[in-house]
Regions:
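Short acidic-hydrophobic, aromatic-tinged amphipathic segments that line or gate anion-handling sites
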Residues: 7-12, 113-115
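Rossmann-like NAD(P)(H) cofactor-binding subdomain of soluble oxidoreductases
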Residues: 4, 11-88, 92
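NAD(P)-dependent Rossmann-like dehydrogenase/reductase catalytic/cofactor-binding core
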Residues: 160-201
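Short pre-catalytic strand/loop immediately N-terminal to key active-site residues, enriched for Gly-Thr
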Residues: 71, 120-125, 177-182
């Protein structure tokens, strides 16, 4: 509390009355009950940031029952280590300056892209769920290394660094992932043979 100036309350209405930016970070199944509690206290000048898959801007507007400034967002779990990716969609009442401010808040733990709402489900697939796929990929590569005799801890180091380095190459070179893949694949080499197996399977 002393270091960051954080105030804690177990009363949702007290929180709404005290803030200019309200983050609704509860499980989707609790959204309606929380909105019912607070909607009469939400001000027209407040910014509301939501974090809940499936809760559309139109659904939220209906539940609040009045014109409110809402930015719908979808971060992913790498935000826990400051490397997240967040999609953000403002409604028609949010100004350009306000969406810029929201992006500044979100950039504290992730990269941010402002998107149209029709792409939010795509964000869930390509960013929200995909860390699980990457974790499975890392585990599979490490398992293969362990099978060949490498200690588990060392296998994870190799697999994780390969993923981190490869991702950085895509970001920093600007090259198409397919082009970068081709750079690794020597004619008749082991990599292209492995790629062919992955493509078939």
């Amino acid at each position: 509390k002393n270091m960051y100036g954080i105030h804690v309350s177990d009363n949702n209405v007290d929180v709404v009355d005290a803030v200019d930016v309200l983050v609704l970070a509860v499980k989707p199944q609790y959204y309606e009950s929380v909105i019912t509690q607070i909607k009469d206290h939400v001000r027209a000048d407040q910014l509301i940031i939501t974090i809940a898959p499936g809760k559309t801007l139109s659904w939220l507007a209906e539940k609040f029952g009045k014109d409110v400034k809402i930015v719908r967002t979808m971060p992913n779990t790498p935000a826990l280590v400051g490397e997240g990716m967040t999609g953000a969609t403002p409604n028609e009442f949010v100004t350009e300056a306000e969406i810029k401010y929201v992006c500044e808040i979100l950039s504290g733990f992730s990269k941010v892209e402002v998107i149209s709402e029709k792409l939010m489900d795509t964000v869930v697939a390509v960013s929200g769920s995909s860390p699980a796929y990457v974790f499975m990929f890392i585990e599979a590569m490490a398992d293969a290394a362990v099978e060949q005799g490498m200690p588990r801890a060392q296998a994870y180091k190799f697999a994780v660094q390969a993923v981190m380095g490869s991702a950085k190459m895509v970001l920093e070179t600007g090259k198409h992932p397919g082009e970068l893949k081709d750079m690794v694949c020597s004619p008749a080499g082991t990599t292209i043979k492995a790629v062919r197996v992955l493509e078939k399977e």
